[in-house]
C-alpha cells in the first residue's frame, strides 16, 4: 500500500492536502486536490465499479484530469500538460475516499 498523509491547510478556506511519501505520485495528489472537491462521489464510484468487479475497466473525465481504470492500476492524466502517473487502483480509491471524507467535514460546518 502507498504511504501518504492528509493535512488540512489554509485558515480562511481550509482544504485537505494529500502528500504521498513517494514523489512519483505527486500528480495523484494534485488530481485529488483539483478534482475530488467537485467530483468526489463520481471518482469513488468509478474506482469502486472496477475494484468490485462490476466492470473490467473504467474511466473518469474531470475538468483537468482523466482516469483510465483497471483492476490493478489506474493511469491519471493531466489533460492540459499531458503528464501521467500510474497508481494502484485500490490505493487511489482509499486515498480518494479519505480525501472526500475530510473535504466533506470541512464543508458541512
Language-model features and meaning:
Residues 36-40, 94-97, 106:
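Short, low-complexity, polar/charged sequence segments that are solvent-exposed and flexible
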Residues 1-60:
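The feature represents the first ordered module of a protein
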Residues 45-97:
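Amphipathic protein-protein interaction modules
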Residues 19, 30-33, 82, 89-91, ...:
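Surface-exposed beta-strand edges and their flanking turn/coil or helix-capping segments
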Residues 101-109:
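Short, Lys/Arg-rich amphipathic alpha-helical interaction segments
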Amino acid at each position: 500500500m502507498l504511504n501518504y498523509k492528509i493535512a488540512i491547510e489554509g485558515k480562511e478556506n481550509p482544504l485537505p492536502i494529500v502528500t504521498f511519501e513517494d514523489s512519483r505520485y505527486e500528480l495523484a495528489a494534485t488530481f485529488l486536490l483539483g478534482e475530488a472537491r467537485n467530483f468526489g462521489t463520481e471518482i469513488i464510484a468509478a474506482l469502486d465499479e472496477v475494484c468490485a468487479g462490476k466492470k473490467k475497466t473504467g474511466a473518469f473525465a474531470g475538468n483537468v484530469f482523466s482516469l483510465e481504470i483497471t483492476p490493478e492500476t489506474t493511469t491519471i492524466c493531466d489533460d492540459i500538460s499531458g503528464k501521467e502517473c500510474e497508481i494502484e487502483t485500490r490505493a487511489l480509491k482509499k486515498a480518494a475516499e479519505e480525501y472526500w471524507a475530510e473535504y466533506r467535514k470541512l464543508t458541512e460546518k
